[in-house]
From Swiss-Prot:
Domain of life the protein comes from: Bacteria
Enzyme active site: Y22, H99
Its job: Catalyzes a trans-dehydration via an enolate intermediate.
Descriptive protein name: 3-dehydroquinate dehydratase
Subunit organization: Homododecamer.
Record bears the keyword Lyase: yes
Pathway the protein takes part in: Metabolic intermediate biosynthesis; chorismate biosynthesis; chorismate from D-erythrose 4-phosphate and phosphoenolpyruvate: step 3/7
Positions of substrate binding: N73, H79, D86, L100, S101, R110
Site (Transition state stabilizer): R17
Family classification: Belongs to the type-II 3-dehydroquinase family.
InterPro entries: DHquinase_II, DHquinase_II_CS, DHquinase_II_sf
Top enzyme class: lyase
Length: 157
Protein backbone atom coordinates (compact mmCIF):
# COMPACT_ATOMS: atom_id res chain seq x y z
CA UNK A 1 0.00 0.00 0.00
CA UNK A 2 1.25 3.47 -0.91
CA UNK A 3 -0.04 6.64 0.75
CA UNK A 4 0.90 10.17 -0.28
CA UNK A 5 0.92 13.00 2.26
CA UNK A 6 0.90 16.47 0.75
CA UNK A 7 1.54 19.60 2.79
CA UNK A 8 0.79 22.95 1.16
CA UNK A 9 2.10 26.48 1.60
CA UNK A 10 3.48 27.64 4.95
CA UNK A 11 3.19 24.23 6.60
CA UNK A 12 6.98 24.11 6.67
CA UNK A 13 6.66 26.80 9.36
CA UNK A 14 4.68 24.64 11.79
CA UNK A 15 6.00 24.94 15.31
CA UNK A 16 6.84 28.61 14.74
CA UNK A 17 3.79 29.90 12.87
CA UNK A 18 0.90 30.88 15.13
CA UNK A 19 1.32 28.03 17.64
CA UNK A 20 -1.92 29.09 19.33
CA UNK A 21 -3.72 28.10 16.10
CA UNK A 22 -1.55 25.34 14.63
CA UNK A 23 0.20 23.92 17.70
CA UNK A 24 3.88 23.58 18.54
CA UNK A 25 4.62 20.35 16.66
CA UNK A 26 6.85 20.84 13.62
CA UNK A 27 6.25 19.42 10.17
CA UNK A 28 9.30 17.17 10.55
CA UNK A 29 7.82 15.80 13.78
CA UNK A 30 4.45 15.17 12.11
CA UNK A 31 6.11 13.40 9.19
CA UNK A 32 8.17 11.25 11.58
CA UNK A 33 5.03 10.20 13.48
CA UNK A 34 3.29 9.34 10.21
CA UNK A 35 6.30 7.41 8.90
CA UNK A 36 6.46 5.42 12.14
CA UNK A 37 2.79 4.45 11.88
CA UNK A 38 3.11 3.55 8.20
CA UNK A 39 6.23 1.44 8.78
CA UNK A 40 4.48 -0.44 11.60
CA UNK A 41 1.88 -1.73 9.13
CA UNK A 42 4.11 -2.12 6.07
CA UNK A 43 2.82 0.92 4.21
CA UNK A 44 4.96 3.08 1.94
CA UNK A 45 4.40 6.72 2.89
CA UNK A 46 5.69 9.52 0.67
CA UNK A 47 5.56 13.08 1.95
CA UNK A 48 6.03 16.40 0.21
CA UNK A 49 5.72 20.03 1.24
CA UNK A 50 5.88 22.99 -1.06
CA UNK A 51 4.91 26.62 -1.04
CA UNK A 52 4.31 26.31 -4.80
CA UNK A 53 1.18 24.78 -6.29
CA UNK A 54 3.00 23.53 -9.38
CA UNK A 55 5.46 21.50 -7.30
CA UNK A 56 2.58 19.74 -5.56
CA UNK A 57 0.95 19.02 -8.92
CA UNK A 58 4.24 17.63 -10.27
CA UNK A 59 4.42 15.31 -7.24
CA UNK A 60 0.84 14.11 -7.78
CA UNK A 61 1.47 13.49 -11.47
CA UNK A 62 4.62 11.51 -10.70
CA UNK A 63 3.38 9.50 -7.71
CA UNK A 64 -0.41 9.62 -7.68
CA UNK A 65 -1.35 7.15 -10.39
CA UNK A 66 -0.52 4.11 -8.27
CA UNK A 67 -1.27 5.61 -4.86
CA UNK A 68 -3.75 3.81 -2.64
CA UNK A 69 -4.57 6.94 -0.69
CA UNK A 70 -3.82 10.65 -0.58
CA UNK A 71 -3.80 12.84 2.50
CA UNK A 72 -3.61 16.54 1.73
CA UNK A 73 -3.43 19.66 3.82
CA UNK A 74 -3.53 22.22 1.02
CA UNK A 75 -3.03 25.21 3.32
CA UNK A 76 -4.17 28.40 1.61
CA UNK A 77 -4.52 26.48 -1.67
CA UNK A 78 -7.68 25.09 -0.08
CA UNK A 79 -9.49 28.25 -1.13
CA UNK A 80 -8.14 28.95 -4.61
CA UNK A 81 -5.96 26.02 -5.78
CA UNK A 82 -8.04 25.04 -8.80
CA UNK A 83 -5.10 23.49 -10.65
CA UNK A 84 -4.31 21.39 -7.57
CA UNK A 85 -7.97 20.41 -7.35
CA UNK A 86 -7.91 19.29 -10.98
CA UNK A 87 -4.73 17.26 -10.43
CA UNK A 88 -6.40 15.47 -7.51
CA UNK A 89 -9.61 14.88 -9.48
CA UNK A 90 -7.86 12.87 -12.18
CA UNK A 91 -6.56 10.29 -9.68
CA UNK A 92 -8.45 7.22 -8.47
CA UNK A 93 -7.17 7.01 -4.89
CA UNK A 94 -9.31 8.10 -1.95
CA UNK A 95 -8.41 11.64 -0.84
CA UNK A 96 -8.63 12.92 2.71
CA UNK A 97 -8.38 16.69 3.17
CA UNK A 98 -6.82 17.53 6.54
CA UNK A 99 -6.67 20.86 8.36
CA UNK A 100 -4.92 21.33 11.68
CA UNK A 101 -7.31 24.03 12.84
CA UNK A 102 -11.08 24.09 12.63
CA UNK A 103 -11.36 26.26 9.54
CA UNK A 104 -15.09 26.74 10.17
CA UNK A 105 -14.37 28.59 13.43
CA UNK A 106 -12.04 31.02 11.69
CA UNK A 107 -12.34 33.79 9.11
CA UNK A 108 -15.17 33.33 6.59
CA UNK A 109 -12.79 33.04 3.61
CA UNK A 110 -11.42 29.83 5.17
CA UNK A 111 -14.85 28.18 5.07
CA UNK A 112 -14.68 27.47 1.34
CA UNK A 113 -12.63 24.59 -0.04
CA UNK A 114 -12.16 23.98 -3.75
CA UNK A 115 -10.56 20.65 -2.77
CA UNK A 116 -13.54 19.27 -0.80
CA UNK A 117 -15.66 18.40 -3.87
CA UNK A 118 -13.01 15.93 -5.07
CA UNK A 119 -12.09 14.61 -1.62
CA UNK A 120 -13.57 11.51 -0.06
CA UNK A 121 -13.62 13.18 3.33
CA UNK A 122 -12.33 16.04 5.42
CA UNK A 123 -10.81 16.20 8.91
CA UNK A 124 -10.47 19.62 10.54
CA UNK A 125 -9.61 20.97 13.94
CA UNK A 126 -7.89 17.94 15.46
CA UNK A 127 -4.33 19.19 15.08
CA UNK A 128 -1.62 16.84 13.84
CA UNK A 129 -3.68 13.85 14.95
CA UNK A 130 -5.97 14.49 12.00
CA UNK A 131 -3.24 13.08 9.76
CA UNK A 132 -3.15 9.89 11.85
CA UNK A 133 -6.92 9.56 11.64
CA UNK A 134 -6.67 9.89 7.86
CA UNK A 135 -4.07 7.09 7.75
CA UNK A 136 -6.28 4.87 9.90
CA UNK A 137 -9.24 5.46 7.60
CA UNK A 138 -7.14 4.66 4.53
CA UNK A 139 -5.86 1.49 6.20
CA UNK A 140 -9.48 0.51 6.72
CA UNK A 141 -10.09 0.76 2.96
CA UNK A 142 -7.15 -1.53 2.16
CA UNK A 143 -8.15 -4.34 -0.15
CA UNK A 144 -11.17 -2.56 -1.59
CA UNK A 145 -9.21 -1.86 -4.76
CA UNK A 146 -9.35 1.03 -7.22
CA UNK A 147 -12.47 3.10 -7.30
CA UNK A 148 -12.87 3.44 -3.55
CA UNK A 149 -13.04 7.23 -3.80
CA UNK A 150 -15.37 7.09 -6.76
CA UNK A 151 -17.70 4.68 -5.01
CA UNK A 152 -17.71 6.84 -1.89
CA UNK A 153 -18.48 9.92 -3.97
CA UNK A 154 -21.00 8.10 -6.13
CA UNK A 155 -19.58 9.78 -9.23
CA UNK A 156 -18.08 6.94 -11.27
CA UNK A 157 -18.71 3.24 -11.84
Amino acid sequence: MKILVIHGPNLNMLGRREPEVYGSVTLDEINAILQERAAAVGVTLLTVQSNHEGALIDFLQAEGWDADGIIINPGALTHYGLALRDALAMLKAPIIEVHLSNVYRREPFRHTSVIAPVATGQIAGLGWRGYLLAIEWLLGTRGQGPGTRDQALGTRD
